[in-house]
Amino acid sequence: IMPGSGINKTNIVNVISPEGAYIVHENVVLIESAVGNGQIDFGEDLELLLIAENVGVDGASNINATVTSSDPYVTIENGDILFDFIGPGLTSDSNNSINISIATSVPDLHPITFDIQYSNGTDTWESSFNLNAHAPVFEIANPVVHDENQDGIWDPGESATILIDLINSGSSDFHYPTASMVSNSDYIEVTTDDNTNTFYVIFSGSTYQGEFQLNSDAETPDGTIASLT
């Protein structure tokens, strides 16, 4: 595991022939056009530049490689890459990169497995690697009710403001999120303006405060428990 990179290298024991070339995956470089934070994030389109290693005893040239994945959270737009020549014991960057798209619904820290098949027209070698996807995870905590007359009791017919901690406990920032509240009670109306709880960004590991305005109906029975979503 490369700390902080989100890239896992799978431990695979390869039985190497005492002659000829043998190509394996060595590393991958993320090429990002948007966030540029060195990790693959939910909803991101990016390129992958692959690095291959020849652990055999002979060089290999004109190596075509095809990258695939059966993971439902990634789409590979063009998975074919080329290596001109890899000498024995050496590594080489691919001539071109592959384009991938990460689903917005990917769970935080979900490992995505990519399979690679290398071929020089005579021999074929198979390898794989994992990338961890990153996404925000939202939680709410510490609701505080401020009633209109500030006596600590939310009375029938009274307005109130609820302050709630909005927590992003995931490993990815979330830009332009909006927090909204829905009342599941016939006696409570949410009156907050739609744009009140729109943020530029909620960073990973950060807490922001949401503010919501509500009104209780004048006919609200005493002791009513209001369900809010």
Q: Would you name each region that the model predicts?
A:
Residues 51-74, 79-81, 167-188, 193:
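Short acidic, flexible loop segments centered on an aromatic residue
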Residues 1-20, 99-137, 215-229:
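Terminal connector regions
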Residues 75-106, 188-220:
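Intrinsically disordered, low-complexity Pro/Gly/Ser/Thr-rich segments with frequent PxxP/GP/PP motifs
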Residues 35-44, 150-158:
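Short, solvent-exposed loop/linker segments at the N-terminal edge
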Residues 26-36, 142-150:
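Short, solvent-exposed loop/edge segments of extracellular or virion-exposed proteins
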Residues 49-53, 66-68, 97, 101, ...:
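Residue-level recognition of well-ordered beta-strand positions that form the cores
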